Amino acid sequence: MLFNTLALISLLIVLMLLNTLVGICPSLLACLIRWKESVNLDASVKLGRDRDIMALCMLIPFCLTVFRFRLYDPSWTDGMLPNPRLAAIIGIFAAYVALRSVLEYGFRSKKMNPKTYKTACKASYTFFSVLTLLLLLTGGVLSFIGVNPEDIKNAMLWISALIYMLFIIRKFQIFVSSCSFFSGFLYLCALELIPTGAVIASAVIF
């Protein structure tokens, strides 16, 4: 099964990079508390690189978690066999990442400090990694103690919503450190509401 193969690959990658992943965790958690920690993280070449590696390592586990607990469960996936459904989820996530990248490139402005803009955009790497770790921990613990799968799903969705809200706040704070309140709001709408809204719409409407 595709799920088992990808899970094994993910496990091997995590084991190979375990020291790097453990070492970056304190910096990632600090970014949840203060927006300036994201600036400090990006100012360090090593920490920035390790954060990027962490985000890459979390890509497959995130998709597997979404698949396993049906966090993204639009009606058009009903009746699909496991492998095609997992492939569809990976495809949707890849499209989401691609759309974010295009928007981040297209909305770059000379009026904003390039380093600040880069830090704001890369904050998604930090919060994505933290979210994935929390989802894995939640799924593992609640499954082990026998919690109903639907309750696990709801808990994960609440965690996802809270982390995303915190991410929005921190990203906005980074933006307004280099531009006006209104400009920061417009950047946030363009870079976050469009791609995230598209994913939500694909799950609710279709």
Functional labels for PLM-detected ranges:
Residues 38-90:
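Hydrophobic alpha-helical segments and helix pairs
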Residues 52-69, 94-95, 99, 129-138, ...:
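Hydrophobic alpha-helical transmembrane segments of multi-pass integral membrane proteins
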Residues 136-206:
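Terminal transmembrane helical module of multi-pass membrane proteins
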Residues 1-16, 82-96, 150-160:
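Alpha-helical transmembrane segments
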Residues 26-29, 70-78, 106-115, 176-179, ...:
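Membrane-interfacial segments
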Residues 75-144:
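Alpha-helical transmembrane segments with an aromatic anchor "belt"
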Residues 4, 49-53, 78, 82, ...:
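Hydrophobic, aromatic-rich alpha-helical transmembrane segments
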